[in-house]
Amino acid sequence: MRKFIPLLAALALSACSSLGNQAFSGESATFGSDNILRNDVLKIVRTAEAASFNCRNIESVHSKINSAHKVHGRMQVREVWTVRACGQAHRYNIGLFEDARGETDFTVRLISR
């Protein structure tokens, strides 16, 4: 649970930060002091952009929390990330799930092609 506390604190945080050339805006449970979770999710999004759209240049990410609640005592957060890459916008469903060790597992799914 200790590792998940920064994730919960970030829920209320409206953040704008950058990593390399990517500008992040909006609200996300992945934003935190070290952004490790955000960067892990972004790696999967980058892979999806390269595989689906042959694009390796992510310009910006805008995130929105759709829901955050506990299931069996563990947090689950659902977000939508709108990714601008190579002049196009694509949306991804991001799922964040607290595991038994207090760490966070995640899923990334392209909403539509």
Region locations from a protein language model:
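Sec-dependent bacterial lipoprotein signal peptides
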Residues: 1-17
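Cysteine-centric segments in proteins
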Residues: 17-113
